């Protein structure tokens, strides 16, 4: 991992999805992403793009698992498991650990955690690629990538 911050501004939801797709295409498996941002900043759009880049068959099925907490998608001919975790409704770090977070972190999976700021103590022990999303305007989003591996494609 490197500690360089990379800033990208997207001008629409479609561009945010395209950015996610570029990121997903470059992944090898074993990555954990911590997505942080307020409501409506594009976390789920970015995850939809990452899933598409990983070869998910139906990216339209990608939705925020706010009530079920974890969605699983399959990419690259079933070889990559994509775990989409939404920590928005999680009340404690213990509840997050009880989801089996560590079991999802495998070489054949990519783990994407929305609202990761709520569970940072658990993520501190894991090498995470952090994606911080912010509103710039009604349509623009600033995405700051931290701790990205050298092979990660963001531009």
Where are these regions (language model features)?
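N-terminal pre-Walker A segment at the start of P-loop NTPase domains
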Residues: 2-20
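The conserved Walker
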Residues: 39
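Hydrophobic anchor at the beta1->P-loop junction of P-loop NTPases
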Residues: 33-35
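Short phosphate-coordinating micro-motif centered on Lys-Gly-acidic
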Residues: 4-6, 91-155
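Post-Walker A helix-loop "phosphate-sensing" segment adjacent to the P-loop in P-loop NTPases
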Residues: 52-61
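Phosphate-binding P-loop
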Residues: 24-29
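Conserved lysine of the Walker
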Residues: 43
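Switch I (G2) and immediately adjacent beta-strands of P-loop GTPase domains
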Residues: 67-91
